[in-house]
């Protein structure tokens, strides 16, 4: 009995730690989100960026998104561009400059595609879906983890119908995933990117990753 009680206490402590880390991670994501939406000096707003590509493509959303993705992939594989960004955006201490710079570009790309789909970037659910897209997280799986049964693929419309407490739990899961993947150890073990300070960016990895993220964003925000 004593052993079982100890195991339960240890399990609860582990869950509590994950919640705390998740909240910490979500706060960091919030800072990255605000910074990406605000942009660096002289950059267009995300809304203006989305409108520019829509205008260039005659209002065809998927075509505009594909064109946007190609441009962002180019940015994420250009060492000079990422190095320049590193000095202009404020990054959490646990994130290397190249990772933060790539995420800045990727968040703006996802957000612009969301705008093309008619979504507001001030909507909390949209913000959560932006990061689920960035982190390659299937929201349907997260819903199951927090006790919500759903037979269908999770959508923005479904999330909007759920209580705020559920969204909070989802955000904690996203925050924990973020710290696990992009914490200092995670960068080395999972992403294997050489810091910009060393003068090299793993352009091939950024190209593949950014392209995949863009494709996911189209599925989430444009293919309803």
Task: Identify the residue ranges that each predicted region occupies.
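Terminal, membrane-proximal amphipathic helices
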Residues: 1-85, 104-224
């Amino acid at each position: 009995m004593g052993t079982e009680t100890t195991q339960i206490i240890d399990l609860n402590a582990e869950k509590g730690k994950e919640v705390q880390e998740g909240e910490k991670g979500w706060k960091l994501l919030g800072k990255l989100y605000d910074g990406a939406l605000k942009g660096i000096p002289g950059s267009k707003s995300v809304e203006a960026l989305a409108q520019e590509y829509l205008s260039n493509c005659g209002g065809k959303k998927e075509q505009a998104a594909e064109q946007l993705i190609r441009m962002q992939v180019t940015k994420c594989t250009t060492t000079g561009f990422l190095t320049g960004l590193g000095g202009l955006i404020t990054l959490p201490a646990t994130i290397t400059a190249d990772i933060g710079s790539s995420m800045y570009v990727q968040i703006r790309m996802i957000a612009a595609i969301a705008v093309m789909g008619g979504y507001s970037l001030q909507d909390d659910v949209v913000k959560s879906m932006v990061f689920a897209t960035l982190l390659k997280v299937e929201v349907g799986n997260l819903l199951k983890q927090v006790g919500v049964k759903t037979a269908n693929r999770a959508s923005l419309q479904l999330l909007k119908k759920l209580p705020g407490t559920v969204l909070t739990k989802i955000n904690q899961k996203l925050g924990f995933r973020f710290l696990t993947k992009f914490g200092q150890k995670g960068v080395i073990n999972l992403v294997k990117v050489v810091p910009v300070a060393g003068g090299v960016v793993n352009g091939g990895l950024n190209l593949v990753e950014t392209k995949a993220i863009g494709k996911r964003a189209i599925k989430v925000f444009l293919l309803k």
